[in-house]
């Protein structure tokens, strides 16, 4: 590429292999495991010969199943050719020569079906099996190294005794199965009773809650109704008071008006006309003084009863 190529800088840290944390014995986890009896180089399971190295995380860049790469490295069966092609045909020829043609054909057919299924779903299924040497079928537990060795030695001696004790073993197995079944039934009954109890309690709680909510709603409704009724009554009383006040004000105004009118207007009769009236203190303007004088004279003549009698020629 030369100078025109892209520059790639590599930076190496203080711990490129990331081993400081594993070598550090002052960590809490390391100290805690040592207190429990663990030592560096030992496994963490029941089996001592398990993996003791650190687990490394690798990026998965394909759609294969878990463990498919390991299966390619290690042959799963005698017909697993890996990357070699045409080995199954060679195995057929060898099978015909050895007289195991049927067995080999079955194995090849099974392998062909597995390949078809794996190609269809895009997943490679790996069948897991348990080693017979580390697993006790009767007790269903992992065996230690000592017990496995003893079993191997005793298996030769106890081959003759196995025939006689087969009946007793079957009886024991039946008894164990029966006890297990009874335990499971008891467990299921207990679980069912607990579930029923929980359901009942839940139902009761729900009913109580619903009842409480109903009562609260009813009380709230009653309070609202009472409040509305009270507000309506208060409004009605206020309205009535207002109307009464308005009526009273109107009546008072009317009475005042009537009194005023009565004061101002009096009935005009013959006697009232003949009777002398009080002189009014009326301020008259200067320009109307002549007219007012003439009006006063005329009024004076009307007020005088004697003068009127003379005018109308009435003899008393």
From Swiss-Prot:
GO terms for molecular function: enzyme activator activity; nucleic acid binding; telomerase inhibitor activity. It holds the Pfam family G-patch. The keyword Protein transport does not apply. SMART domains: G_patch (SM00443). Keywords: Nucleus, Ribosome biogenesis, rRNA processing. One of its GO terms (biological process) is rRNA processing. PROSITE patterns: G_PATCH. The keyword Nucleus applies. Residues 179-195, 210-240, 261-270 have a biased composition (Basic and acidic residues). Residues 196-209, 241-260 have a biased composition (Basic residues). It is found in: Nucleus, Nucleolus. Residues 25-71 form the G-patch domain. It comes from the Eukaryota. Residues 146-280 are annotated as: Disordered. Involved in rRNA-processing at A0, A1 and A2 sites and negatively regulates telomerase. Belongs to the PINX1 family. PANTHER family: G PATCH DOMAIN CONTAINING PROTEIN (PTHR23149), PROTEIN PXR1 (PTHR23149:SF31). This is Protein PXR1. It comes from Debaryomyces hansenii (strain ATCC 36239 / CBS 767 / BCRC 21394 / JCM 1990 / NBRC 0083 / IGC 2968) (Yeast).
């Amino acid at each position: 590429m030369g100078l025109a190529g892209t520059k790639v800088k590599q930076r190496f840290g203080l711990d490129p292999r990331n081993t400081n944390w594993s070598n550090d014995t002052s960590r809490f986890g390391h100290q805690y495991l040592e207190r429990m009896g663990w030592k560096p180089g030992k496994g963490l399971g029941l089996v001592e010969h398990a993996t003791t190295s650190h687990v490394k995380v690798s990026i998965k860049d394909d759609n294969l199943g878990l463990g498919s790469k390991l299966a390619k490295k290690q042959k799963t069966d005698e017909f697993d050719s890996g990357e070699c092609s045409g080995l199954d045909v060679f195995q057929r020829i060898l099978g015909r020569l050895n007289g195991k043609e049927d067995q080999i054909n079955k194995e090849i057919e099974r392998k062909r079906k597995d390949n078809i299924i794996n190609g269809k779903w895009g997943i490679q299924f790996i069948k897991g099996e348990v080693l017979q040497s580390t697993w006790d079928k009767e007790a269903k537990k992992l065996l230690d190294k000592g017990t496995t060795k003893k079993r191997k030695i005793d298996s030769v001696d106890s081959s003759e005794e196995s025939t006689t004790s087969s009946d007793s073993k079957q009886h024991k197995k039946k008894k164990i199965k029966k006890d297990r079944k009874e335990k499971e039934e008891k467990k299921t009954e207990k679980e069912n009773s607990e579930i029923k109890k929980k359901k009942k309690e839940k139902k009761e709680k729900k009913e109580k809650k619903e009842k409480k909510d109903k009562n609260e709603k009813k009380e709230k409704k009653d309070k609202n109704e009472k409040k509305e009724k009270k507000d309506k009554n208060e409004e009605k009383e206020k309205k009535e008071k207002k109307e009464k006040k308005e009526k009273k004000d109107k009546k008072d105004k009317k009475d005042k008006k009537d009194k005023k009118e009565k004061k101002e207007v009096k009935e005009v009769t013959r006697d009232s006309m003949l009777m002398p009236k009080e002189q009014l203190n009326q301020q008259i303007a200067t320009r109307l003084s002549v007219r007012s004088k003439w009006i006063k004279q005329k009024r004076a003549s009307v007020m005088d009863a004697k003068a009127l009698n003379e005018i109308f020629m009435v003899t008393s």
